[in-house]
Regions:
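Conserved, mostly hydrophobic/aromatic
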Residues: 14, 116, 174, 246, ...
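Glycine-rich phosphate-binding active-site loops on the catalytic face of alpha/beta enzymes
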Residues: 245-263
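Core active-site phosphate/anionic-ligand binding loop and the adjoining beta-turn-alpha structural block
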Residues: 237, 270-273, 280-337
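Active-site beta->alpha loop and helix N-cap motifs at the rims of alpha/beta catalytic domains
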Residues: 43, 47-163, 180-183
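Alpha-helix-loop-beta-strand connector modules within alpha/beta enzyme cores
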Residues: 57-82, 131-143, 189-208, 213-224, ...
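Catalytic cores of alpha/beta
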Residues: 157-161, 232-245
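Terminal or standalone catalytic/regulatory effector modules within metabolic enzymes
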Residues: 37-38, 43-54, 309-312, 319, ...
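N-terminal small/glycine-rich loop or linker at the start of catalytic domains
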Residues: 1-22, 74-91, 108, 138-149, ...
Length: 510
């Protein structure tokens, strides 16, 4: 049996899956980061450009400062950033030089482990981004194989991609990313060996300027990781199957940030792995402390706790995650058309096939579900098309894995709006953007202002430094004090218990 490592996802993907990425503030993270640093995790899945935008927009906190502070609080555990290499914060593609600057600043701030995820599996883009990250100083680069079920996403398809990743010197590891929780234990038993076989192939070792005949064969042993969500209840079993099949690391979450649509519960995964004979070098006492902290935080902040999910076979057909499904159902209910929900879900499967089987991760579920809604409610299919759907067919999000249905592509691109979007100017270079922005701002502020509304960045700066201390046990008391302060005629407060007395009077110190 094997020694299995854990990558904790509580701070980013667990937070995003269960709390909409808005649950954790700087203070929440800094309170537990030193403990997480000592648990024995291989890495902490920490942030993305989307999360950085949420820090500014929702919490009015500086995401760059959060990275620096967390790196200082957890210096022994790599912090992980996930991105596509096409965008930064906004969903619009940005200039490559702006991405280079962002990666440079992320490394300087304290990020050392980077995941390259291209939902279209455009390998040219993946390899280009990996080179960019290596030049920026990234210590560990992981390429993502994003799992889905379709006519084109076969074991051979993923194995072929893995072979290209294995041959890239800038990629250190590969992980199977299963964002919808679709990977069954049975499917894992064919997929993982196929991928690992290509990751272990002999490759030609060459210097940068060496001719092929001067190289030597070496065995490439790039490890494989698994990141699988619990959306339909399969992930805990799939993780155990993956460990038996030679996966080096599993991605998990802690306490209230596990289960539901998040990742498997770390404590339960560790116990099950050991039961099967695997070893996991984790400090169980500290792991329990981390889990307890997030459970207490959820209770204090009235945030939902992830619960184990029951198996839902229909999900394998439409692959629409809970959040997008809930939004679609609500939209239909508001229109008095709730009875059409089943028809929309059936149309989702058809639209996805016609668009070349995009993997259902943001923004593609929104594009596919929106188009399905238009098709079901309109007089004819593709009579109405969103700008994002047009941009998708134009290739603005990358090259689709399979060709878009020619008739559908013609219907979408023949409309006047498509011609307008075709004429959109390319992304502005950093030099052009700097000419539009205030002089003498730091690179970090420039990156925020180049990709976010000015008012949001101004509000963040005006809010001042983020709080750095948090205790979930004090939250009810602080809420009580805040509520009492708002009551008219309240001139004093006394808290009295054995061994402790606090008396507050208006205008006095006691």
């Amino acid at each position: 049996m094997a020694d299995i490592e854990l990558v904790d996802t509580s701070l980013r993907d667990g937070n995003q899956s269960l709390w909409g990425a808005t649950g954790l503030t700087t203070a929440h993270i800094l309170q537990i980061a030193p403990v997480m640093d000592r648990v024995g995790f291989r890495a902490l899945d920490f942030t993305s450009s989307t999360h950085m935008g949420i820090s500014v927009r929702t919490h009015k906190e500086d995401p760059w400062e959060l990275i620096r502070l967390t790196h200082a609080a957890a210096p022994h555990t790599p912090l992980q950033f996930i991105g596509s290499g096409l965008r930064f914060i906004s969903w619009e593609p940005v200039h490559p030089d702006l991405i280079r600057l962002a990666y440079d600043r992320l490394v300087v701030a304290g990020m050392s482990r980077f995941v390259v995820l291209d939902p279209m599996h455009d390998m040219e883009a993946v390899l280009r981004t990996a080179r960019m990250l290596r030049r920026a100083g990234a210590r560990e680069i992981i390429a993502a194989l994003t799992y889905t079920i379709s006519a084109v996403h076969t074991d051979d398809f993923y194995a072929g991609l893995a072979g290209q990743m294995a041959a890239c010197p800038d990629i250190d590891r590969v992980y199977v990313k299963d964002p919808a929780g679709l990977l069954t234990p049975e499917a894992a038993r064919t997929l993982i060996p196929a991928v690992r076989a290509r990751l272990g192939e002999a490759v030609l070792a060459l210097g940068d300027d060496d001719p092929p005949e001067s190289g030597s064969l070496r065995r490439n042993t790039k490890p494989l990781e698994l990141h699988s969500h619990c959306t339909i209840g399969l992930s805990p079993l799939t993780c155990l199957a993956a460990a038996d099949l030679g996966v080096a690391a599993l991605h998990t979450a802690c306490g209230s940030l596990a289960n539901g649509t998040s990742l498997p519960n770390a404590e339960r995964v560790v116990a099950n792995l050991r039961e099967l004979g695997h070893t996991v070098d984790i400090d169980d006492r500290l792991l329990a402390r981390v889990a307890g902290y997030f459970t207490d935080l959820a209770l204090a902040e009235s945030l939902p706790a992830g619960q184990p999910r029951e198996y839902d076979a229909s999900f394998l057909r439409h692959q629409v995650a809970g959040g997008v499904m809930t939004t679609t159902r609500r939209q239909l209910d508001e229109l008095g058309l709730g009875d059409r929900f089943g028809a929309v879900m059936d149309e989702v499967s058809r639209v996805r096939a016609e668009l070349g089987y995009p993997i259902m991760v943001t923004p593609f579920p929104q594009i596919v579900c929106g188009q399905a809604l238009y098709n079901v409610l309109g007089n004819e299919r593709y009579q109405h098309v969103s700008d994002q759907a047009i941009r998708y067919v134009l290739g603005r999000f990358g090259r689709p894995t399979a060709a878009v249905d020619p008739d559908v592509a013609d219907r979408i691109l023949s409309r006047p709006r498509a011609r307008e979007l075709t004429a959109e100017p390319p992304p502005a270079s950093p030099a052009e953007l700097r000419r539009r922005l205030p002089a003498r701002i730091s690179d970090e502020e420039f990156l925020l202002r180049a990709t976010m509304p000015a008012g949001e960045v101004d509000a963040m700066l005006a809010a001042g430094p983020a709080r750095r201390h948090y205790n979930p046990g004090l939250k009810p008391v602080l809420d009580l004090l805040a509520g009492l302060r708002e009551r008219p005629g309240m001139s004093g407060l006394v808290i009295d218990k054995p061994g402790f007395r606090l008396e507050l009077r208006e205008g006095t110190r006691q």
